[in-house]
C-alpha cells in the first residue's frame, strides 16, 4: 500500500505541472512590433508568415493569442490608435472654436514633424491606410477601424455643436 500511495502522489504532482515548454510570450510587445511592421510595410503588403518570421513568434502561438490574422491586425490597429494623441482637451481649452481648432491642428502638425524627424519612425497613418483598404482587411479589423474613426468624428461633432450653441458658428 505504501508504494501505491507514493505512485498516486507522484502522478498527482506530475499532472499538476504543465507539460511542455513554459510560455514566454509577451502579448504587448508582440502587438507593438506587429503594429510597427504593419505601419512600416503596409497591412496589405504584410503576410501573416512575414509577421511570424519578423517577430520570431511561431504562427501557432500567434493563432493561440489572436485567433487569426484579422485578430492580430485588429489588435495592432487598437494599439496604434491608443498611441496617437488626439489632444481632445485642446478642442475645448479656450471655449473659442477657432482658437481651439488652430491649437489642435498646430499640435498635430508639431507632432508630425517630431515623429518624422526620427528616421526609425514609419511615415503615414496606419489608421487611414486601413480605411482605404476597406474590405481588403478582415471584419474584426474593419470594426476596429470604424470604432476609431467614429470616436474621432464624435469628438469633433461634440465640439462643433458646443460652438454652435455658443453662437460661434
Outline where the language-model segments fall.
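Hydrophobic/aromatic residues within well-ordered alpha-helical segments
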Residues: 69, 76-80, 84, 101-108, ...
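Short alpha-helical elements of helix-turn-helix
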Residues: 28, 32, 125-130
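Hydrophobic alpha-helical connector segments
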Residues: 75, 89-123
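Short helix-capping/turn signature of helix-turn-helix
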Residues: 66, 129-137
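Helix-turn-helix
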Residues: 11-12, 29, 33, 37-79
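N-terminal intrinsically disordered/low-complexity leader segments
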Residues: 1-25
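Amphipathic alpha-helical packing segments from all-alpha helical-bundle domains
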Residues: 99-103, 122, 137-166
Amino acid at each position: 500500500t505504501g508504494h501505491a500511495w507514493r505512485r498516486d502522489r507522484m502522478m498527482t504532482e506530475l499532472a499538476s505541472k504543465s507539460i511542455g515548454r513554459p510560455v514566454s510570450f509577451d502579448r504587448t510587445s508582440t502587438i507593438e512590433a506587429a503594429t510597427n511592421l504593419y505601419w512600416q510595410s503596409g497591412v496589405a503588403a504584410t503576410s501573416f508568415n512575414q509577421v511570424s518570421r519578423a517577430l520570431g513568434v511561431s504562427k501557432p502561438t500567434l493563432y493561440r493569442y489572436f485567433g487569426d490574422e484579422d485578430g492580430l491586425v485588429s489588435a495592432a490597429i487598437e494599439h496604434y490608435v491608443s498611441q496617437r494623441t488626439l489632444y481632445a482637451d485642446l478642442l475645448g481649452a479656450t471655449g473659442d472654436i477657432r482658437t481651439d481648432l488652430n491649437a489642435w491642428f498646430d499640435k498635430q502638425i508639431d507632432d508630425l514633424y517630431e515623429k518624422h524627424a526620427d528616421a526609425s519612425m514609419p511615415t503615414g497613418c496606419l489608421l487611414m491606410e486601413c480605411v482605404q483598404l476597406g474590405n481588403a482587411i478582415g471584419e474584426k479589423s474593419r470594426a476596429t477601424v470604424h470604432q476609431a474613426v467614429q470616436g474621432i468624428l464624435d469628438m469633433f461633432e461634440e465640439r462643433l455643436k458646443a460652438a454652435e450653441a455658443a453662437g460661434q458658428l
